[in-house]
Amino acid sequence: MTFDQRLLLVHAHPDDESIGQGATMAKYAAEGRGVTLVTCTGGEMGEILVPELTHLAADQEDRLGEHRRGELDAAMAELGVTDHRYLGGFGTYRDSGMKWHEDGHAVPADDIHQNAFWHADLTEAADHLVAVIREVRPQVLVTYDQFGGYGHPDHIQAHRVATYAAALAAVPSYRKDLGAAWDIAKIYWGAMSESRMRAALRALREAGDTTAFEGMDPDGPLPPFVTADEDLSAVVDAQEHVEAKLAAMRAHATQITTDGPFFALSNNVGNVAWGLEFFRLAKGERGELNQDGLETDLFAGL
């Protein structure tokens, strides 16, 4: 099936898509727009939150990636998304892992696997995505900002690969064997609204929840994944699709627990916590704006 409007999302690990843009994906899929997800790794180094599955860990049986493949399939079914690929095919790039810096953001781990995405050759990885771009021909691309939200090396690498691939895909003389050139009209970085985050934190604290997003003060400095409202470009109101997003998050059971911070946010703040998804425009012209000066559709102006 050929869709008139086509969205491509590039994410690092299974579950990133559901947390970041799950509601938008469900909304656009339900509206009959094309939604394609490219996941760069299998998430092999993720923390396992299900005790009976800890044997799948990288330092034991090393089968978490295959298990998370099934979780992602289930999540896509919940979102109504039928076009999902792994960059270069499943198993091409491995989750790089990470560690926490004393300043509170992620940095590369001390010991990184030789096939880790962080070590990937940029042009080779980009070429895998160029082929997808030229096949799908999306008008809109969504990925991370240059810091990967919170510094995870795979998020940063996904940003680099997506950005480079988008540029290469538009060059008619570049790798003609990968398909006809395609210039993506608009590129967005996923974002989180500062005012919304502060309001959500305040609601959590007033409800007596001091553990969800521990260490984050609604009136204090916030981590780098939070974006000042003045730097936001678009908001997609997909509150009608929050249940699909939450169901997709539940499908990633090894990574997200229903008693964790994400669901605490939903329980205390309601659908608005997860149904409004924000973006920063990195390439392209802005379309029609709402009263807050934001686009309400990623395809606005196209």
Curated annotation (Swiss-Prot):
UniProt superkingdom: Bacteria
The keyword DNA damage belongs to this UniProt entry's keyword annotation: no
Cofactor note (record): Binds 1 zinc ion per subunit.
Reactions accelerated catalytically: 1D-myo-inositol 2-acetamido-2-deoxy-alpha-D-glucopyranoside + H2O = 1D-myo-inositol 2-amino-2-deoxy-alpha-D-glucopyranoside + acetate
Disulfide bonds: none
Names of required cofactors: Zn(2+)
EC numbers on record: 3.5.1.103
Annotated keywords: Hydrolase, Metal-binding, Zinc
GO biological process, one term: mycothiol biosynthetic process
Binding-site list for Zn(2+): H13, D16, H155
Function: Catalyzes the deacetylation of 1D-myo-inositol 2-acetamido-2-deoxy-alpha-D-glucopyranoside (GlcNAc-Ins) in the mycothiol biosynthesis pathway.
Name of the protein: 1D-myo-inositol 2-acetamido-2-deoxy-alpha-D-glucopyranoside deacetylase
Native source species: Nocardioides sp. (strain ATCC BAA-499 / JS614)
Lineage of producing organism: Bacteria, Bacillati, Actinomycetota, Actinomycetes, Propionibacteriales
Name of the gene encoding the protein in the UniProt record: mshB
